[in-house]
Amino acid sequence: MIMVRRRARPAKETGGGSAAAAVASDGALSMDTAAAVAVAGGNHLLDDQYFASPKRKDCRLMKASENLKISSDVVALEEEANNKGVKPTKALTDRTIGVPLATRSQTRTIENFFKADAAAKCGITLNTHHPEPIKEQKTISTTELPLSDELGDEELERVVGDLLYDGHSTASSDSPSYQNENEHEEVMQDTFALRETSPVPVLMADFQTHRSGLRDSHSSSHSSSSSGGASATTDNIFLQEPVLTLDIDRTPTKASSIKINKSFELASAVFSSPPSVLNACRFNQIVTLNGGGQCEPQPVVVAQPQPQPQLQLPPHHNGFELDQHDSSSCDSGVACNLTISAESPAAGGGAGAAARRRKPATPHRILCPSPIKTLPRGDGGGLIVPGARKTSGIMMKGDLLSPRKSPRKLPTTTAAVAACKSRRRLNQPKPQAPYQPQQPQPPPGTQPTNEDVVAAEELENLNKIPIANSNKSNNHVKAMLKPAPAKPRAALTKGSKTKTGSKIQPGPLPLAATNGNREMTDFFPVRRSVRKTKTAVKEEWLRNLEQAVLEERSEGLQVRNFMGKGRGVVAVRHFKRNEFVVEYVGDLISISDATDRERRYALDENAGCYMYYFKHKNQQYCIDATVDTGKLGRLINHSRAGNLMTKVVVIKQRPHLVLLAKDDIAPGEELTYDYGDRSKESLLHHPWLAF
């Protein structure tokens, strides 16, 4: 819908024909009818104000009561002037006739006209919110208005136009279309002149509805400056004047672009600590830090140790190995498969629980918990004990701690690289000194012993050659420029013999033959290495063990009684790691003999169990130390976290069990080792085996 903006028009005058028709009618329009027409006009005025947009800057809403009061005041002034016979001195141009409407009312649609026409024909009246009755002005002679049905369409439009239009609205005068004040005053004067010729006094009612009160409270910047304080403020935030404005920066901006770098450059350290191997596994590419070149993803390979099963090695013949990773507990179980026949009272199926509880056939067994693998030496001796863990050898020097405390062993490649470096360093060519002319070598019989002094004297003699004998000296120098022929190396070889068989000791080479350089061995003797190889260290250590077994050493040990254990052995001196402590001495018997002895010991209530089972060269053996021989090895108590370990040493084709220090043992510490028996029957009768 297109809105057309119009200027304020003067109030239309009712035609003479209309006035005559009104006088000639049957009767004047009653006061109720006049009030109804006025109220209908005010109602349509409110509807027209409702359609006015409060967001327009040139829009202004006024109260209907004030506009109606203005019309009543105009009629009162005209009547007072007629009574006095004098025209009003005050110009009526300052007054406003009708209701001051907004610009939207000036550009109303045809719909408002039909609404006013329908209301006038039906004669509908509006009840105001004011309970006061309509006051009549007795001083004003009421003039009858023609009925709406008697008036034509043209006259009805004029009457409604007088009620709805106000050419002197301050809101309209403040709009941009009324910037010329002189023109506005002329239009207002013409309007009042027309109204004075034929006044139409109408009794108006002062009313105000609730909805109009809420709408009229809205005031804009234009209405507040021209209404003279007529508008009021409201608490409705939707009808208040906006106080915030948007200041949009309309300056043109530069075109932005996105740059993608091919590599990332780190300005500072990203990680507070060095990255670990696990962090390196989380990334599959390496980012260059120099910012140049393309970064290609490179896989990061991290070697992770995988647990390997324990293997049993076949017999070796080049050396032996010592178990360096012995644990405090033994999971090897029973080393030999012993079965108790039905004749045993403890193992018989028909025997009762009392027979079993009386004494087991095997109270407990001393099993080799972690026997150390021993490779046979050149004489054919040695042991291979299956079930033990694979070891990498022993170290005597600098390896005196337990496997948990021992330093990490260097790989063999390190020693090979060091040897290659030493070989390259020794095979480097000798630096050549500048050639210096020297005098012929004197006869061997007159050669002094101190060669340094002789060389210094030769240099001094060369500087003191007289100038007169220049020819002789030149010839002499030319002769010295030719180096003396070196003797063949074969003749100088140490230990070489002549035809007569006598050895020739090599003498020092002349300085001319060596170009003025001397051998390092002329000043320093040859230093021989005193370090021993790993094989030599092992052999020496085994010889010491054999010597200790043959001598039956038991030094630094003492027997003591312990609460709940009985007798035990403590150390009275310091023992180093892998040092010989004591031998487990007893009768070396086979498995069949051990089975018979177990049956016999089961019948004796006072007999203990001192039978040590172990395996040697894929054959099961047992050392029976039940008989008290006074040896201290049989008195060492059990502990799963013991400080001793067992090793098999072969001497004269006979295996011996020796106990070595697993860690450094301080004086006063009890000596213990793991018996290795984890059978249910043994744990049932001897619960202390679990500790």
Swiss-Prot record:
Protein source organism: Drosophila pseudoobscura pseudoobscura
Catalysed transformations (reactions): L-lysyl(20)-[histone H4] + S-adenosyl-L-methionine = N(6)-methyl-L-lysyl(20)-[histone H4] + S-adenosyl-L-homocysteine + H(+)
Keyword Ubl conjugation: no
Highest taxon of the lineage: Eukaryota
Enzyme Commission (EC) number: 2.1.1.361
This protein's record includes keyword Nucleus: yes
Compositionally biased spans, kind Low complexity: 220-232, 484-503
Task performed by this protein: Histone methyltransferase that specifically monomethylates 'Lys-20' of histone H4. H4 'Lys-20' monomethylation is enriched during mitosis and represents a specific tag for epigenetic transcriptional repression. Mainly functions in euchromatin regions, thereby playing a central role in the silencing of euchromatic genes. Required for cell proliferation, possibly by contributing to the maintenance of proper higher-order structure of DNA and chromosome condensation during mitosis.
Stretches with biased composition (Pro residues): 431-446
UniProt similarity note: Belongs to the class V-like SAM-binding methyltransferase superfamily. Histone-lysine methyltransferase family. PR/SET subfamily.
PANTHER family: N-LYSINE METHYLTRANSFERASE KMT5A (PTHR46167:SF1)
Keywords on record: Cell cycle, Cell division, Chromatin regulator, Chromosome, Methyltransferase, Mitosis, Nucleus, Repressor, S-adenosyl-L-methionine, Transcription, Transcription regulation, Transferase
Top enzyme class: transferase
Record-given protein name: Histone-lysine N-methyltransferase Set8
Compartmental location: Nucleus; Chromosome
Annotated residues for binding of S-adenosyl-L-methionine: K565, G566, R567, Y610, N637, H638
One of the GO biological process terms: regulation of transcription by RNA polymerase II
Positions of the UniProt region annotated as Disordered: 1-22, 211-234, 345-381, 422-450, 484-516
GO molecular function terms attached to this record: histone H4K20 methyltransferase activity; histone H4K20 monomethyltransferase activity
Gene Ontology annotations for the cellular component aspect, listed alphabetically: nucleus; polytene chromosome
Domain SET: 555-676
